[in-house]
């Protein structure tokens, strides 16, 4: 048997260079590159291996471990899970910073390979710098926290363990039904230890992502269910995009006259203008999709996890005869809502159903309902685009909260811009193939409802975990995946302040991204949530501490985000009017470096809910009558929802 004497880290790098995926007959490298932040826990081990021979891996320098791991996830998401980035960090806090990203990737079923440095396997220098000591179990390190949020976790305590660990890692990373974060912990001493690895460990490995076919029995059951139903509705989930099944979904909708709503992950699989595309569905959905969904007698979920936002906490579907048909590659997700399960690739399942349903000449019984619902939403959308603030008699979209306070915000922020009008103008002015990236705050709701996707795969929303601070790093990841397209991070001031470190990496790599920063000086959507459930405004506005009350109810904070970003070398713009916004968007397109447009918008001018409810933990007992009323409303709504 031929062997190669290498360190554990060198063997890992060589192995990663030999991984390929094949999908629909097309083969490509699986691991595009690796994000690094070096510390004592990885620099002389994995860092040495990368310096000596990185092979074809592109090595990137991150600025924050969570930021670079978010970028890696966004890269894989934009690549439809067919190519990934790895991430290496040092031991302790560097590793811990990636835990949030691991959770984000696993929640979204997006493959990311995390390689956190770890404490010494020998324990000789214990406690090493940045080591946690647990007196009840000395084998525990910070990296054990990854177990809860990883789809596969392993620790390499001996060099020869690398082989089985990485074979299993690739199994999970290339499995569409169970992919997510894979964490391989690398003790810093083991990274540098040598072993005689067999040559066959480094052979070219092609991981074929196969399309699972539906069984004849499940297909027959699905046909029987559909033919009994008159008003079905489909839900286009992220699985439609990852399975590249958009054309088949279009064909299914057009052939059988069945409309579909979009989840955040599924949006832009098909253009918004398609006659059967109702748009966003659920808590952050629009009036068209939610109105049709309420009356549907069959819900066909395609590649969706049926989160509470999609089902409106399982209260959206009000037809007493409604049933569920779930098409999903994952048996776990297909099993939800007591559904009839078709465990299969979305494309193959749709093609099989098309053949079977054409045999019986199936048609839904919709007449004008689909067109009427879309027309009603277009009318509402036009209204939202044209909302303008007036100092007197202005009623914000989220009314009853700040009606008397808005003039204070006008003065403090120097703006009269409404969020819906800003989104409308951005949607009009961006290139049709531009990619928008979002994750947290009020913007995901506005974008799922309002954004018109004019080209496929241009809407990139991380809403499986709604990770605050994902947006800027996510934009970098999307840009690395599609460097020829303009990429825009749609981010609020709250999320931007949590994390935007990879803006600097975008400059370093000459990968231009555009940050559209909506500043309403607060955590606006959570302010809406608390006040909408009977509370006052508490801890969600960005106000100075009042020296008299000792509370955060002083003057409104105004931050010059443009000036801050300019210090990095970003081209920046200040915007307080639609005219300035148009000039900034046109100017940003001409730039070759990353840009940031600091857009001051008024709170409470985002969209509100349409025909939906969200179950949150309202206080059962309170001295506040409005909280009591909110609890009673919760109980009433819960009675109309499924129990599971």
UniProtKB/Swiss-Prot annotation:
Matching Gene3D superfamilies: 3.40.50.970, TPP-binding domain (3.40.50.1220)
Amino acids binding thiamine diphosphate: 65
GO cellular component assignments: acetolactate synthase complex
Reactions catalysed according to its record: 3D-3,5/4-trihydroxycyclohexane-1,2-dione + H2O = 5-deoxy-D-glucuronate + H(+)
GO molecular function, one term: thiamine pyrophosphate binding
Domain of life: Bacteria
Top EC class for this record: hydrolase
Membrane-spanning segments: none
Gene Ontology biological process terms in this record: inositol catabolic process; isoleucine biosynthetic process; L-valine biosynthetic process
InterPro entries given in the database record: DHS-like_NAD/FAD-binding_dom (IPR029035), Myo_inos_IolD (IPR030817), THcHDO_hydrolase_firmi (IPR023757), THDP-binding (IPR029061), Thiamin_PyroP_enz_cen_dom (IPR012000), Thiamin_PyroP_enz_TPP-bd_dom (IPR012001), TPP-bd_CS (IPR000399), TPP_enz (IPR045229)
Signal sequence extent: none
Cofactor note: Binds 1 Mg(2+) ion per subunit. Binds 1 thiamine pyrophosphate per subunit.
Pathway: Polyol metabolism; myo-inositol degradation into acetyl-CoA; acetyl-CoA from myo-inositol: step 3/7
This enzyme's EC code(s): 3.7.1.22
Positions that bind Mg(2+): 493, 520
Keywords, sorted A to Z: Hydrolase, Magnesium, Metal-binding, NAD, Thiamine pyrophosphate
Reported function: Involved in the cleavage of the C1-C2 bond of 3D-(3,5/4)-trihydroxycyclohexane-1,2-dione (THcHDO) to yield 5-deoxy-glucuronate (5DG).
PANTHER family in the cross-refs: 3D-(3,5_4)-TRIHYDROXYCYCLOHEXANE-1,2-DIONE HYDROLASE, THIAMINE PYROPHOSPHATE ENZYMES
UniProt record similarity statement: Belongs to the TPP enzyme family.
UniProt name for this protein: 3D-(3,5/4)-trihydroxycyclohexane-1,2-dione hydrolase
Organism, as annotated: Bacillus thuringiensis subsp. konkukian (strain 97-27)
């Amino acid at each position: 048997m031929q062997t190669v004497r290498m360190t554990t880290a060198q063997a890992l790098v060589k192995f990663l260079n030999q991984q390929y995926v094949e999908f629909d007959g097309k083969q490509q490298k699986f691991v595009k590159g690796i994000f690094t932040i070096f510390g004592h826990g990885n620099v002389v081990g994995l860092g040495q291996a990368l310096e000596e021979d990185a092979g074809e891996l592109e090595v990137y320098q991150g600025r924050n471990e969570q930021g670079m791991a978010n970028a890696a996830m966004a890269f894989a998401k934009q690549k439809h899970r067919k190519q990934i980035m790895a991430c290496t960090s040092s031991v302790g806090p560097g590793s811990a910073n990636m835990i949030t990203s691991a959770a984000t990737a696993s929640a979204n079923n997006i493959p990311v390979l995390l390689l956190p440095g770890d404490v010494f396997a020998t324990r000789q220098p214990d406690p090493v710098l940045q080591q946690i000591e647990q007196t009840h179990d000395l084998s525990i390190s910070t990296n054990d926290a990854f177990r809860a949020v990883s789809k596969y976790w392993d620790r390499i305590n001996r060099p020869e363990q690398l082989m089985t660990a990485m074979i299993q890692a690739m199994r999970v990373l290339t499995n569409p039904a169970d992919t997510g974060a894979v964490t391989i912990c690398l003790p810093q001493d083991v990274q540098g230890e040598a072993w005689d690895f067999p040559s066959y460990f480094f052979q070219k490995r092609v991981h074929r992502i196969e399309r699972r076919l539906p069984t004849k029995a499940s297909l027959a059951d699905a046909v029987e269910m559909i033919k009994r139903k008159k008003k079905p509705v489909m839900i286009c989930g992220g699985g439609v995009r990852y399975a590249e099944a958009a054309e088949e979904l279009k064909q299914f909708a057009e052939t059988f006259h069945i409309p579909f709503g979009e989840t955040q992950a599924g949006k832009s699989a098909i253009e918004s203008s398609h006659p059967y595309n109702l748009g966003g569905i659920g808590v952050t959905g629009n009036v068209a999709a939610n109105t049709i969904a309420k009356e549907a007698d069959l819900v066909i979920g395609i590649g969706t996890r049926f989160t509470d936002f999609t089902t409106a906490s399982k209260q959206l579907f009000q037809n007493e005869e409604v049933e569920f048909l779930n098409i999903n590659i994952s048996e776990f997700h297909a099993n939800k809502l007591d559904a009839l399960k078709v465990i299969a690739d979305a494309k193959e399942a749709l093609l099989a159903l098309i053949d079977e349903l054409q045999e019986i000449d199936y048609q839904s019984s919709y007449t004008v309902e689909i067109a009427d619902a879309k027309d009603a939403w277009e009318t509402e959308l036009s209204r939202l685009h044209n909302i303008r603030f007036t100092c007197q008699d202005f009623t914000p979209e989220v009314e009853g909260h700040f009606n008397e306070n808005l003039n204070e915000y006008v003065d403090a922020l120097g703006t009269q811009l409404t969020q819906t009008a800003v989104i409308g103008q951005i949607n009009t002015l961006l290139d049709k193939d531009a990619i928008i990236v979002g994750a947290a705050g009020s913007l995901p709701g506005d974008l799922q409802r309002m954004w018109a996707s004019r080209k496929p795969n241009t809407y990139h929303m991380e809403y499986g975990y709604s990770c605050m601070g994902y947006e800027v790093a996510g934009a970098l990841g999307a840009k690395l995946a599609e460097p020829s397209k303009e990429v825009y991070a749609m981010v609020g001031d709250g999320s931007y302040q949590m994390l935007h470190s990879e803006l600097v990496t975008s400059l370093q790599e000459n990968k231009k991204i555009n940050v559209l920063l909506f500043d309403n000086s607060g955590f606006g959507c959570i302010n809406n949530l608390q006040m909408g459930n009977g509370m006052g405004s508490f801890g969600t506005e960005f106000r100075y501490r009042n020296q008299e009350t000792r509370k955060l109810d002083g003057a409104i904070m105004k931050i010059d985000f443009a000036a801050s970003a300019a210090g990095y070398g970003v081209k920046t713009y200040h915007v307080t009017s639609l005219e300035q916004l148009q000039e900034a968007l046109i100017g940003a397109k001409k730039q070759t470096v990353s840009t940031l447009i600091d857009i001051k918008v008024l709170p409470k001018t985002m969209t509100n809910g349409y025909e939906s409810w969200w179950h949150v933990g309202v206080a059962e007992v309170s001295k506040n009558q409005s909280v009591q009323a909110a609890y009673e409303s919760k109980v009433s709504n819960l009675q109309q929802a499924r129990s599971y």
